[in-house]
Amino acid sequence: MKKKYLLFFVLFLCVACDSGDIEEHVASSANKGRIVKLTATLSGIGTWESGFAVSLAGFTTGDNYAQVVRTLPSTTPDNTEVELVLSNLDAEINTAELAITNRLRERIITLASINLDEYPETSDTIRMDVGTIDVAPFSSLQRGLFNVACIQCHGSNGRSAAGLTLTEGQAYAQLVNVPSTRIEGVMRVAGGDTHASLLSQILNEGGEAILHYNHTEVLSSQFKENQEGVRLLIDEWINGIRD
């Protein structure tokens, strides 16, 4: 049976009996503003290392650091139905996002987002219903990286460069402990070893010329302000593989 948590976030007031051990950070104060209510059924929260967290956060355009962030506790059980509320969101906050953040409130991967500029003066609660999401590390990479920046060449429209498909349901099996078709003796992803993983090599500094296509440009174009965070997230996922 799903467990349901009602979690309210108010910038000036924190009601302890509702928030449990959920962490909150506020980077700026605000007068009365917009309210966003996230509804989601989440799994995989407890699989994250301590440096990352699953959060509902408000961002200003051009700033990769959240103005306000609410972090879900790592003890949240799988298949938990969560209702999470952000209140007092002023006009400087342009998006509300379900995201993977780090300890500095930096956005690493966006899992779902709503454009608050479409609700400039509303007094009604803005509802953000994202359905069921697996937020474990690989699933987050699938949703926030592969689906956004990779499947155009690896899986969509029947195109799979290097015979690699990175669409949902295919990516893990085609990456982990699978030999590269381009470089002999190298795994696409060597579970537990970033240094032996072609994916890590081609996305990190020095990987520009490993293959005929410069994959570092994928990160620089899609993740301008947080390339290093995405690289770290990929490496953390690889190092955590125990297959």
PLM-predicted stretches and their roles:
Residues 148-157, 161, 165-243:
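Electron-transfer interface patches adjacent to heme c in soluble/periplasmic c-type cytochromes
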Residues 2-8:
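Sec-dependent signal peptide recognition
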Residues 135-154:
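Sequence/structural segment immediately N-terminal to covalent heme-attachment motifs in c-type
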Residues 10-42:
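Bacterial Sec-dependent N-terminal signal peptides
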Residues 79-95:
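Short Pro-Gly-centered beta-turn/loop motif in secreted/extracellular proteins
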Residues 19, 103-129:
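Structured interaction patches on ligand/partner-binding surfaces of diverse proteins
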Residues 64-79, 113-116, 169:
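Solvent-exposed serine/threonine-rich low-complexity stretches and specific carbohydrate-binding patches
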Residues 46-63:
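Short, ordered, surface-exposed loop/turn motifs in non-cytosolic proteins
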